[in-house]
Design a protein with these regions (language model features):
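Charged, amphipathic alpha-helical segments and their flanking helix caps
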Residues: 1-23, 45-160
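Short acidic low-complexity segments
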Residues: 25-36
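A short, glycine/Asx- and small/polar-enriched loop/turn
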Residues: 34-40, 145-148
Length: 160
């Protein structure tokens, strides 16, 4: 996968393993909201790719936003969306490092045997993607009938 797809997979996997949140609507995947049922819409927004240092072949720093829109049924008041927002803010807390290993990375082998590290973990040809959370915040809720929506913005960065 490309670095952007690894970042997306890292954040999406972290979101999917969050306990207590409603169904997740992903980018470019068919999703039909059901009136009366809450959901979270997730969008990855890459914002920049810049050299981390000067010189030949510098490491690149990627920055972006992970935009989450919590949609709860209209008429429940703002608290329903804020309850989910609190779970997401805790899950994507500032200074959190999220580690993602692409399941399609090849295992490094020698003579048909996996090369193991001292702790008996396998050595991958690639390295895991580490996405760091810069900040997470809640924005003002708004009505989008039949849903009341609460935006959560998560700023992230990674080096590659």
């Amino acid at each position: 996968m490309t670095i952007i797809n690894d970042i997306r997979a890292c954040l999406d996997t972290h979101l999917s393993s969050t306990v207590g949140i409603p169904a997740i609507a992903r980018q470019n995947v068919p999703f039909e909201p059901t009136t009366g049922t809450s959901f979270v819409k997730a969008d990855l927004i890459p914002t920049s790719r810049r050299p981390a240092v000067r010189g030949l072949n510098p490491q690149q720093r990627y920055d972006g936003l992970y935009s989450l829109l919590i949609c709860t049924p209209e008429g429940l008041g703002p608290g329903a969306g804020y309850d989910v927002a609190d779970l997401l803010l805790d899950r994507f807390n500032a200074t959190t490092d999220i580690i993602y290993t692409n399941p399609y990375d090849a295992i490094l082998q020698e003579d048909g045997f996996d090369i193991l590290l001292e702790d008996n973990s396998r050595l991958l040809l690639g390295s895991p993607t580490i996405v760091s959370i810069d900040y997470s915040e809640v924005r003002t809720s708004f009505l989008d009938s039949p849903f009341y929506c609460t935006p959560v913005t998560i700023a992230w960065y990674t080096y590659s």
